[in-house]
UniProtKB/Swiss-Prot annotation:
Taxonomic classification: Eukaryota, Metazoa, Chordata, Craniata, Vertebrata
EC number: 3.6.4.-
Organism: Xenopus laevis
PROSITE patterns according to UniProt: ACTINS_1, ACTINS_2, ACTINS_ACT_LIKE
Annotated protein name in UniProt: Actin, cytoplasmic type 8
A Pfam family per the record: Actin
Function: Actins are highly conserved proteins that are involved in various types of cell motility and are ubiquitously expressed in all eukaryotic cells.
Subunit structure: Polymerization of globular actin (G-actin) leads to a structural filament (F-actin) in the form of a two-stranded helix. Each actin can bind to 4 others.
Positions where Methionine (R)-sulfoxide occurs in the chain: 45, 48
Family matches, as PANTHER family: ACTIN (PTHR11937)
InterPro entries reported in the protein's UniProt record: Actin, Actin/actin-like_CS, Actin_CS, ATPase_NBD
Enzyme class: hydrolase
Principal subcellular localization: cytoplasm
Catalytic function, reaction form: ATP + H2O = ADP + phosphate + H(+)
Length: 376
């Protein structure tokens, strides 16, 4: 236990899930939904110990009586009071540590507004009294986790998708592209197409059921048109799914129509490019000399890249866009759901990284803006 006393804490705050644990571990100890729930009704049972807010799994399990809010939208914190509740819950209930005893590594979305990283820094030092902290860019950590320092990361989570070209460990900000299309949009889309089939999902609680459907039977078709034809002519692609109340629903072409929206955002009424084209555009914004390295090191990361078939489809689509002689390699590590966290765990335990931490003393001398000088 002795060495854990000083272990750094690594917290990857995603729009959908918060991943937290100790640097040096190979997986996060705690993974829970980034949600804060407040009761919809007045409590009637006296002495029940009802709280005015619930966080994470507890909010999830009581979702029927709560209104659920996500403090992180599109990868960026929009509600700081709720965010503080999530961090408090992470330290005291999930990891059971005293934050004033451990350095904390937090993650941020690429192109996160400057004011946001300052606010994170301020809360860590002033509310939680951490001895040291650091803010790292999510996609860069995913690349470290795959054992590379150069490549392009297509990171797609619950709230946002980014394509981030990285050369020798540095993200190239001019070529980072953001796509506001991710897991949550796919959940909403699946709700819509299931409603068209006559199943009704409307409340925030029912949306969580649809999220589960999205994660279990869905996959990415290699050839969408052909798959649609197969689904129309036979029932070979149908799968049944049991709802919490025992009702069984059958889903057919929804299985691949849902994630297809990643490649064809027009399905959601969006005019943006699909993930394959966004990745290609990101590469094209980079210096011509490094493109070859990016094509050969295209790393997928985040929960929304967990669909079976997604790597083959990316390979096919990017091959069609790139010069014909180009070697294209899509890397889809099996643990990519947590690769941001794993990269953070690796980074925070490197001996060379120890001088990179922002200390409480530096913060007291310079204020929150220190984060821009020390974390890049």
């Amino acid at each position: 236990m002795a060495e854990e006393e000083i272990a750094a804490l690594v917290i990857d705050n995603g729009s959908g899930m918060c991943k937290a644990g100790f640097a040096g571990d190979d997986a996060p100890r705690a993974v829970f939904p980034s949600i804060v729930g407040r009761p919809r009704h007045q409590g009637v049972m006296v002495g029940m110990g009802q709280k005015d807010s619930y966080v994470g799994d507890e909010a999830q399990s009581k979702r029927g009586i709560l209104t659920l809010k996500y403090p992180i939208e599109h990868g960026i914190v929009t509600n700081w009071d709720d965010m503080e509740k999530i961090w408090h819950h992470t330290f005291y209930n999930e990891l059971r540590v005293a934050p004033e005893e451990h350095p904390v590594l937090l993650t941020e979305a690429p192109l996160n507004p400057k004011a946001n990283r300052e606010k994170m820094t301020q809360i860590m030092f002033e509310t939680f009294n951490t001895p040291a902290m650091y803010v790292a860019i999510q996609a860069v950590l995913s690349l470290y986790a795959s054992g590379r320092t150069t490549g392009i990361v297509m990171d797609s989570g619950d709230g946002v998708t980014h394509t981030v070209p990285i050369y020798e460990g540095y993200a190239l900000p001019h070529a980072i592209l953001r796509l506001d299309l991710a897991g949550r949009d796919l959940t909403d889309y699946l709700m819509k197409i299931l409603t068209e089939r006559g199943y009704s999902f409307t409340t925030t609680a029912e949306r969580e059921i649809v999220r589960d459907i999205k994660e279990k039977p869905c996959y990415v078709a290699l050839d969408f048109e052909q798959e649609m034809a197969t689904a129309a002519s036979s029932s070979s692609l149908e799968k049944s799914y049991e709802l919490p109340d025992g009702q069984v629903i059958t889903i057919g072409n929804e299985r691949f129509r849902c994630p297809e929206a990643l490649f064809q955002p027009s399905f959601l009424g969006m005019e943006s490019c699909g993930i394959h084209e966004t990745t290609f555009n990101s590469i094209m914004k980079c210096d011509v000399d490094i493109r070859k390295d990016l094509y050969a090191n295209t790393v997928l990361s985040g929960g929304t890249t967990m669909y079976p078939g997604i790597a083959d489809r990316m390979q096919k689509e990017i091959t069609a866009l790139a010069p014909s002689t180009m070697k294209i390699k899509i890397i889809a590590p099996p643990e990519r759901k947590y690769s941001v966290w794993i990269g953070g765990s690796i980074l925070a335990s490197l001996s060379t990284f120890q001088q990179m931490w922002i200390s409480k003393q530096e913060y007291d001398e310079s204020g929150p803006s220190i984060v821009h000088r020390k974390c890049f």
